[in-house]
């Protein structure tokens, strides 16, 4: 079954690891030798690393081998005889997630705490998913009715998986976003964890004390919980201004975190990268420990400035929450911006408009475009301002000031919009 599963899904790291360990186990049994899981795991890792050295930096490789390592090293610390199989499953889940914590935070920047319970419920059901799916394939050739029963059973089980995951993701605290820790933090975490494992196994050979085992279990749990909290604090305690210009190809996206801790995004889109919000902007925000953006500014309605923001708005339940979407003045809105505003409202995000002279927080001020709304005067002149066309020349211009540091965020400002900004005198202040 494992071989055919590998053929069907392709040579994924986890499948290759399972297949190689299975062959080593079978070889040991055929030759009459004892099966040594740590040796089997090490040999498999060596074979795959020789085949593809870059696997050592691959998240899938590290997660697959880390899960088995957690069962081999950490689970014995929690292992105590009990009649409750569910409790045993929880301890295995805790051991696996504890070993994978550093990898999860480094590559995915967050921890799903309810996964401890979900694994206890869902993993035991996986053999039934496999059996009903394979049964549906085999029996569909003999009897269409029997095949449909197998497929429907498999579909119901997978639907149960989806519903349960959706339910837990909607619960408070379903995601702990910590940001990406430094590599030294990951090394220290695994150093402490492996030291505790070594100490436990060394003492276990000398004495079998349940109190000591319980103490080690508690200590490991404290290390895991403390590491999550510590990583989150390290990524959110900076009091300095942070400005990051993201590489989104042909497009624009700028992230700002001011001294007060407010997080803002100015534009977010690309014309040559697909799903830029999902695969470029959101992962960056999570890597910085950003759970919520106070403001998302849109300078104008071109696709290479807004399509990523649209993805962020629609994925707030699973991604980064947006408090307020800030758009150009109403007289400069086009159909794309109005559509974006509707998406924001549908996803319970406030929609604001910003005008020249208004501030967002302490450090960000809008200086363009000028509008009739406030009857701005151009250097004291009373003549009516020229009408700008919605789009590039009416781009929102933001001024970022922090002490001696100044930065202009101009969108795609051009033509009469540039002339108006220069004549307004806003650049002289």
Task: Label every model-predicted segment.
Residues 38-39, 94, 126-127, 273, ...:
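A generic short alpha-helical patch detector that favors 3-5-residue windows
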Residues 9, 28-33, 52, 126, ...:
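Generic secondary-structure signature for well-ordered alpha-helical cores
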Residues 69-174:
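Alpha-helical transmembrane segments of multi-pass integral membrane proteins
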Residues 22, 115, 133, 278-279, ...:
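A generic alpha-helix surface/boundary motif
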Residues 22, 41-45, 130, 163, ...:
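Generic alpha-helical secondary structure signal
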Residues 81, 86, 138-429:
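Non-globular, low-confidence helical/coil segments that flank catalytic cores
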Residues 1-116, 181-236, 419:
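Hydrophobic alpha-helical transmembrane segments in multi-pass membrane proteins
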Residues 52, 101, 123-126, 327-328, ...:
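Hydrophobic alpha-helix-in-membranes signature
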